[in-house]
């Protein structure tokens, strides 16, 4: 999911 990618980048 896009949310996982966002937090993963952070």
Swiss-Prot record:
Its main location: secreted. GO terms for biological process: neuropeptide signaling pathway. The modification Arginine amide is found at residue 10. GO terms for cellular component: extracellular region. It is found in: Secreted. It comes from the Eukaryota. Keywords: Amidation, Neuropeptide, Secreted. This is Tachykinin-related peptide 4. Expressed in the antennal lobe (at protein level).
